[in-house]
């Protein structure tokens, strides 16, 4: 049987036919067999039973393909659900973990002296390493770069530094993100195990609400950008933490906040390596990798990938036309 392109050859025509059949697939199939009966010798042209045999074989072939596609789709969905659950569990565990309280231990004078000496030695070693790494003298180019960095820092003054998940740790909840998705963990200090009936989670295309029933919501505001509601989900972890998974519509941007009422994070300090490029489709992944490469090139004062292509084309053209004088030409 034909390949995928051959199969799709008549899709436009058949789709137009299907749209004119109000009775759906059953009416479309009836029309097709009516055509075979009236305009061809399909039913009577061959040996007895051949037409029925061909129909059965064709049906079985496409039924097997359909069942295989359904199994593969279910397997993909199950894998995605499992990965989301594992990711949500990790996020909930991090949100639930409490920093242990400081333990007070009385030191003797000798122990205190030794501890202070170790601290001083460690600090001196770090300072020396930093000096060796950076050099004792600042070059003019380095000074300009530092001035530019100071200027950028001034613009971003007051913004939060992203957490390890490229999101933010706020007083009442924690969120992390990749370019494609965002995960939120909201811990609740309750004396009982939470159930679905105890919480309110409302995920809309541009709005999110999370809280306990009968209580003011912990999260209630307009999202930074739109999400795919049908691909987003939530669950309760360990009976205490509500985790929400949001699928971004725009998979080429970092959110600087979860909802518009949140404090901003400094997206310039986001570490793209913490995001799983493997989670993205091939087209989006290649675009992200190109964006990251261009960003590194710009930071080093080197041409981007597009600029490199232009330079290669120009060089090739110049090599092909040695008779032309480009010495006075100006290129942008």
Swiss-Prot record:
Organism of origin: Mus musculus (Mouse)
Keyword Secreted: no
Region (Interaction with EML4): 174-332
Alphabetical UniProt keywords: Acetylation, Cell cycle, Cell division, Coiled coil, Cytoplasm, Cytoskeleton, Microtubule, Mitosis, Nucleus, Phosphoprotein
Protein name (database record): Nuclear migration protein nudC
Region Disordered, residue ranges: 65-108, 123-171
Tissue expression: Detected in fetal and adult brain, in particular in the ventricular zone of the embryonic forebrain and in the embryonic cortical plate. Highly expressed in brain cortex from new born and adult mice. Detected in the choroid plexus and in ependymal cells in embryonic brain.
Pfam families: CS (PF04969), NuDC (PF16273), Nudc_N (PF14050)
Sites bearing Phosphothreonine, chain numbering: 108
